């Protein structure tokens, strides 16, 4: 092989290696920042079609209804724990160490984002509450619509009482 061809081959191999390294770093960065959406039932039992369950330490988003009577506040800090459930009967515990949104209340739909710290326990970094009685996050509405009809709220829930 003459020196000119050897130089071209070395350059081509280096270029292909560089592109492969950049692509792998890009995919790694995207994968570590990816937040998959789950319902409480999917966290407990896995997704219906694939059986995929979130791993401990994985960043996820979970949506459902706050279980009435499940909220426990720590009087000495902002720490709060509550359960969320879906129509299929799945329920998980969410822990949160910050101020809850003003519209947050039991019996309402929420989406929580955070890290799965144990089976059935989400350490939330962000909690989003619905805006009014007609709004439901698209992911939650889709998940709830797959299992049963639209949820009806009683008068106490509509008025914002606990």
Swiss-Prot record:
Its main location: membrane. It is a single-pass type II membrane protein. Residues 1-8 are cytoplasmic. It holds the Pfam family CcmE. One of its GO terms (biological process) is cytochrome complex assembly. Heme chaperone required for the biogenesis of c-type cytochromes. Transiently binds heme delivered by CcmC and transfers the heme to apo-cytochromes in a process facilitated by CcmF and CcmH. NCBIfam families: PRK13165.1, PRK13254.1-3. This is Cytochrome c-type biogenesis protein CcmE.
